[in-house]
């Protein structure tokens, strides 16, 4: 009732956030597809493209910390105050983060970034998700990934109101196109534990990936937790 034109322009898209996190954790692409479908079917069309797509806020644990594990059981406050990711846990979470951010920036809606997520901040639930910004100690690889996706969103008009076209792919693989009159974009992510090959339309054959794995002919082969973003 809040999105009928006389109350709010947008709301925070927690259903997307939860489904994205579940997908990159478990590979449950069917659940993500169903969540996207429910939002597109039940929300006012004009509001869909204004939804605040986030993967972390001041009300949640930091996204890198969440993605370092398969659940949000971080213990009590005393335990969270001492919690620090090992290098192995951080790198594991970082790989998942790139997948989650790619979905955040390419699904219908507007990406809403919680300060510090683009710099690699970690932490448990409030107040441990509200630390100081790590000036001079940012994870530059993560920052550059966010910056590149931001530039691609500006460049590709299909992300700003374009049609969402889901693909039928094996469980664990999530793919879709965004289309408008002047542009098209293809996003495919493999969160399964097996290598997957996907045939793509002829129009993408000569295109290079703007982010992630490139095509070989008409075939896109993705190892576990690889992805691609192709823009026409």
Where are these regions (language model features)?
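Active-site-proximal helices and loops of the catalytic beta/alpha 8
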Residues: 1-54, 122-148, 201
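Aromatic/acidic polysaccharide-binding cleft in carbohydrate-active enzymes
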Residues: 5, 53-85, 101-139
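Aromatic-anchored helix/helix-loop segment that forms the rim or "lid"
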Residues: 30-33, 37, 71-98, 155
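Acidic/polar loop patches that form or flank catalytic/metal-binding clefts of enzymes
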Residues: 111-115, 157-163
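Amphipathic alpha-helical
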Residues: 146-156
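Carbohydrate-binding surface patches
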Residues: 167-201
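Solvent-exposed beta-hairpin/edge-strand motifs
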Residues: 202-212
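C-terminal beta-strand-rich structural cap/linker in extracellular carbohydrate-active enzymes
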Residues: 218-232
């Amino acid at each position: 009732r809040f999105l009928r034109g006389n109350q709010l322009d947008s709301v925070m898209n927690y259903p997307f956030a939860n489904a994205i996190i579940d997908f990159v954790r478990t590979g449950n692409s069917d659940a993500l597809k169903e969540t996207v479908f429910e939002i597109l079917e039940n929300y006012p069309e004009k509001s869909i493209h204004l939804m605040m797509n986030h993967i972390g806020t001041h009300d949640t644990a930091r996204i890198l910390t969440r993605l370092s594990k398969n659940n949000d059981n971080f213990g009590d406050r005393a335990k969270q105050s001492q919690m620090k990711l090992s290098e192995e846990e951080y790198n594991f979470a970082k790989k998942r983060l790139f997948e989650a951010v790619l979905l955040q920036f390419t699904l219908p809606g507007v990406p809403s970034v919680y300060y510090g997520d683009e710099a690699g901040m970690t932490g448990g639930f409030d107040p441990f998700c509200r630390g100081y910004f790590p000036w001079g100690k940012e994870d530059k690889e993560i920052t550059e990934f966010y910056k590149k996706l931001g530039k691609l969103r500006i460049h590709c008009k299909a992300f700003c109101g374009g049609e969402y076209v889901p693909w039928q792919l094996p469980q664990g693989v999530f793919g879709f196109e965004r289309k408008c009159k002047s542009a098209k974009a293809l996003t495919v992510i493999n969160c399964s534990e097996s290598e997957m090959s996907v045939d793509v339309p002829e129009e993408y054959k000569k295109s290079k990936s703007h982010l992630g794995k490139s095509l070989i002919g008409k075939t896109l082969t993705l190892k576990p937790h690889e992805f691609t973003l192709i823009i026409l």
